């Protein structure tokens, strides 16, 4: 009887260990970079931005979409859409680009309360992939220690409540922002990078930076208006539809 109890106990311990290793979303170092697993299933994210025509996106092979912010009710709607279309959500948490606000206790306390509520409300939702703390905050004047220290604080806050989902931030194509993340926000699971014209240079830029973690392309497309040639009166010259088609194909591969 004693041996039987020991055997049952060992089985329970093993089952518990297996369950904990499979539950949740993790990023792990691999031979050729990083791999993402959802409940033990290796998953390659093929995402779109926003919630417009998710039916077509899903039919085309997309398995995730990204948002830039939202309150509890809006996020519930996003997650319901994700469930309906068998997709995952990278849910944004809006952050200011105004550097002064990162010295403002009123703003920071408001953000702490908001983030705590979101983490507690959605910590077990299986349609949620990740939290994205801020979008390109460095494009204002907030590529400063105070801002990134606060991103790190919020990341730690989320992780103390939500053990299932990943936590990230999204930056523009900006090597200095990568260095800031590496220095001030080590708790992030990955960095999202928004890039258009120099899509093929991203890996090299990451390799040259101080950041050594995982990254995900979170926005991409035709060359941005701020990257194209301009007329003599400084108006950007938009790519033609055919040029856009070509760069979509080139940059996707």
What are these regions (language model features)?
Residues 3-9:
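Sec-dependent signal peptide recognition
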Residues 16-17:
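C-terminal motif of bacterial Sec signal peptides marking the signal peptidase cleavage site
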